[in-house]
């Protein structure tokens, strides 16, 4: 039986109470999920930027943002407003069309990837059944935008940054996909909902991180490289390339890169939470909660409670990983480009391939533990 709150059904029933037909209620509902995704992504970025600035300040024995709101919580909003009102400059010798299209091509696939992120049994924008395949396909578009931005800027530093970004993304996309395929192999499904449901039954012991520790490590390393986080921020290494492919950008175009980078980091953390850490699952079974409250399992209060707990659990697990990513920024040195490519092609790719083959063997030998 499926537990949790079905937002679409509840919203349609609410509108029907005002005399609207099912078709009109469905049409009104259609744009709302994407609006919710945009709001959630932007709020997530604001929280992450504030956390990074405060944690970075603590690592350097500084105070960090302090004056814009309590504890500086409004500083990310102030930064966004500053970029919003800055002049949008296009270099005289740049390719204007590609220069403008580059940031859009970087941001849009990342936002669309949020469509497959579930926060509960029914709290999913689009359960297409091939969510993992859709995410891998969308993530392969981003390097085109990065390379396009570097080329269109007509700047040697931008071009080098774009080439580095494309090489880095391609190098780490393959082991990333292979580590996810091991999860798909155990689940027999490309649906993120099925992957989370497969991790239920024994609480924390059901999580895929215990059956896929190598895949978890490979996925997280590759995700950090895809997000261009230290120690993998070579495309925009300030000491070498000024700001890489972002060098000639200003105003909102620069903000789109900034936004895309942080949305991608949060998305990667959410996917790790879903694929390896049980997603919205929490230790106490829903049946026990309903029995304790003396309510039926499908009571509205139980549905709201399980939906709320599911969202909180998913986000908490994701932000634990974001916290680790921020700490890595101040505890690891930047690698060289040859070291980065060697790590991707000579180590992570063979390890992810071996992990996939071992998973297939374990599935045949122990189907009760590794999927049937």
From Swiss-Prot:
Record EC number = 7.1.1.-
UniProt subcellular location? Cellular thylakoid membrane
| Residues that span the membrane, as ranges | 27-47, 97-117, 128-148, 176-196, 204-224, 266-286, 308-328, 347-367
A Pfam family that this protein carries is: NADHdh
Q: What does this protein do?
A: NDH-1 shuttles electrons from an unknown electron donor, via FMN and iron-sulfur (Fe-S) centers, to quinones in the respiratory and/or the photosynthetic chain. The immediate electron acceptor for the enzyme in this species is believed to be plastoquinone. Couples the redox reaction to proton translocation, and thus conserves the redox energy in a proton gradient.
| Family membership | Belongs to the complex I subunit 1 family.
What is the protein name given in its UniProt record?
A: NAD(P)H-quinone oxidoreductase subunit 1
């Amino acid at each position: 039986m499926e537990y949790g709150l079905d937002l679409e059904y509840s919203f349609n029933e609410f509108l029907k109470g005002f005399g609207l037909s099912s078709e009109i209620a469905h049409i009104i509902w259609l744009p709302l999920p994407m609006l919710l995704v945009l709001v959630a992504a932007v709020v997530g970025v604001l929280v992450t930027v504030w956390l990074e600035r405060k944690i970075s300040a603590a690592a350097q024995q500084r105070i960090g943002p302090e004056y814009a709101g309590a504890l500086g919580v409004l500083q990310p909003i102030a930064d966004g407003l500053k970029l919003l009102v800055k002049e949008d400059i296009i270099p005289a010798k740049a390719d204007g069309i590609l220069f403008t299209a580059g940031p859009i091509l970087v941001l849009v696939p990342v936002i669309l990837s949020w469509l497959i992120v579930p926060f509960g049994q029914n709290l999913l924008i689009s359960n297409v059944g091939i969510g993992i395949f859709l995410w891998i396909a969308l993530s392969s578009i981003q390097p085109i935008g990065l390379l396009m931005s570097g080329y269109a800027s007509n700047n040697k530093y931008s071009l080098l940054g774009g080439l580095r970004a494309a090489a880095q993304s391609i190098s780490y996309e393959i082991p990333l996909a292979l580590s996810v395929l091991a999860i798909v192999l155990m689940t027999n499904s490309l649906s993120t909902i099925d992957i989370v449901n497969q991790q239920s039954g024994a609480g924390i012991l059901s999580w895929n991180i215990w059956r896929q520790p190598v895949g978890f490590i490979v996925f997280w390393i590759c995700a950090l490289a895809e997000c261009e986080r230290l120690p993998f921020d070579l495309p925009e290494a300030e000491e070498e390339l000024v700001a890489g492919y972002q060098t000639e950008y200003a105003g909102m175009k620069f903000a789109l890169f900034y936004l895309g980078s942080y949305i991608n980091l949060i998305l990667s953390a959410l996917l790790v939470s879903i694929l390896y850490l049980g997603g919205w699952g929490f230790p106490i079974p829903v049946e026990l909660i309903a029995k304790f409250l003396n309510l039926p399992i499908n009571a509205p209060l139980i549905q709201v409670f399980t939906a709320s707990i599911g969202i909180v659990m998913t986000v908490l697990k994701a932000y634990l990983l974001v916290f680790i990513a921020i700490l890595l920024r101040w505890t690891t040195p930047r690698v060289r480009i040859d070291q980065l490519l060697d790590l991707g092609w000579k180590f992570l790719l063979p390890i992810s391939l071996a992990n996939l083959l071992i998973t297939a063997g374990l599935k045949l030998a122990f189907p009760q533990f590794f999927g049937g």
